[in-house]
Amino acid sequence: YVDWYGYSASVSPYILEQFEKEAGYRFRPEYIIDQGYYNNQYRVPSREFKDFQAFQRREVAKIAKEMVDITHEYGKEAMMFLGDHWIGTEPFMEEFATIGLDAVVGSVGNGSTLRLISDIEGVKYTEGRFLPYFFPDTFCDGGDPVKEAKENWITARRAILRKPIDRIGYGGYLKLTLNFPEFLDYVENMCNEFRELYTNAKGITPYCVKKVAVLNSWGKIRSWGCHMVHHALYQKQNYSYAGIIEVLSGAPFDVHFISFDDILAEPELLKDLDVVINVGDGDTAHTGGSIWENAAVSSAIREFVYNGGGFIGVGEPSGHQFQGHYFQLADMLGVEKETGFTLNYDKYN
């Protein structure tokens, strides 16, 4: 299986011993195995898994900093490639800045993946590696690298106007491009476009209509990565949900990612927002699952809407069967899902 955000490959006897000393309780294999789901981003994270994540972030940051320090001693910049598997080096969490990286580079698949890179703070610059890679599967007889390059650039370009990356590039075997001069011409034009966009957008606060927050179980740790399975690849089962995040990447909004834990810890944060978005299938981390059994959560959202805030639900927002409802905000949303338990309602003998 693939999981960029997974921690299942980060377990060792040494790590478990250290974790148990810090957390004060025994680590169990089930905390990672998670009924066979391995804590993928659709699973509502357990307290133990969140503890383990926090522990790994701190430990990985320490080790990564040692590597960065060695690099700096040799007078070189330290750059990290974002992607595939970044155990512990969570770019949107506080520990990341302590590593001391000079730059982050990542592969750009769409607007969301571009913002995943460009929104990272605590580095001197960010870089996007565009598609296609210079590999034989594209640069071959019958291949059309220009088409792929156009789709990639046009898809990601709108996000640059909201938050630009600092550099762009490609990866692969350069000699493969020699037989595709039209591709080289297109890349030249694309680079000129980028320079124009960057000159006008860098350091400028773009116009924002409203302040919007995506609400889920993860919050800022999964900023711009919501519903993203294996680098922006199309998934029939979730494209409508991932599409919401993609739209936000280039829309005129000040976008934030908040968790239910954030609301429980500081309900007042909702007062600074104009719109809250809850998007995904019911009983997943993206809509919250059993967290809606906590009256403090639903009360905070209701108060937010009562005071003029907007709430947008896509899919099954607040979806969790509890106390006679599937949508825990059914009264507020004006809609309910029939799950079989109320088929006998509104009927006559």
Region spans (language model):
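A glycine-rich, often tryptophan-bearing local segment used as a flexible ligand/cofactor-contacting loop or short
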Residues: 283, 287-349
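Hydrophobic faces of well-ordered beta-strands that scaffold small-molecule active sites
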Residues: 78-82, 102-106, 124-133, 166-171
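A short helix->loop->beta-strand "cap" motif at the edges of active sites that frequently abuts
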Residues: 75-76, 123-124, 307-310
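Active-site clefts of carbohydrate-active enzymes
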Residues: 117-148, 176-180, 220
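Acidic (Asp/Glu)-rich catalytic clusters
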Residues: 94-98, 114-126, 160-163
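Aromatic-Pro/Gly-enriched surface loop or interdomain linker
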Residues: 157, 163, 185-273, 315
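Polysaccharide-binding and catalytic clefts of secreted carbohydrate-active enzymes
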Residues: 1-101, 107-116
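The substrate-binding groove and active-site-proximal loops of carbohydrate-active enzymes
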Residues: 44-61, 99-108, 132-148, 171-174, ...
